[in-house]
Amino acid sequence: LMNCAQLNLEPNTPQELAYLIPYKDECQFQIGYKGFLQLVYRSGIVSSFNADVVYRAEVENGMFEYRKGITPTITHKVDLLHPEAREGELIAAYAACTLKGGGEGMLRLVDKKDIERAQKTSASLAANKKYGKDSPWISSPEAMWMKTAIKRLAAWLPQTEMLAMAVDLDDKSERGESQLVLP
C-alpha cells in the first residue's frame, strides 16, 4: 500500500490504474497501462501520448506502417467498415508521445519477439499458470502489450522520480522480487 500511496495510484478500481496481486507469501503492486499513462502525464514532460496494439490483418491490409530512422514514424489507419482487422493475431504494440516545449516526438515499437521475451521473464505469469489463476497476459493481452510499449518509452523519457520508481516497482513485480520500500 505504501507504493500505491507514493505513486498516488488507487489499486483495484474500475479506473484500472494499479492492482494489488497475491504472489507467494506477499502482495505485489502492479501498475496497469492506464496507471503508466497517468504517471507520464502527471510528470509534466509530455503534451500528448498514444499507445495501441497492431494486428497481423492490419499490416497485411496496408493499415499499419512503421518507418525506422532518426525520426521514426507510424501510420496506423482504422478501417471502420472492416472492424475484423482489429482481431486475431497481435504482432506489435507501440507508444508515442510529444514532449512539452516542442521538439521531435518520441516513439517505441515492440514486436512480438520483444513481447514474448517480456512474457517469459514474467514471474507473475509463471505463478498464475502454476496455480491455475488468471494472468493479465492471458485475460487482457492487448493491455499488457501496450503496457510493455509504454514502459519501454517511459525508460527513454526525461526521468522524474515518480516515473523511475514506477518502472522499477513494476519490473520487480514482473520478476517476482520484493517491492519493499524503505523510508
Region annotations inferred by a language model:
Residues 1, 26, 174-178:
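Short alpha-helical interface elements
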Residues 2-162:
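Binding-interface segments
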Residues 148, 158-183:
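Single-stranded nucleic-acid nicking/binding segments centered on His-rich, glycine/basic loops
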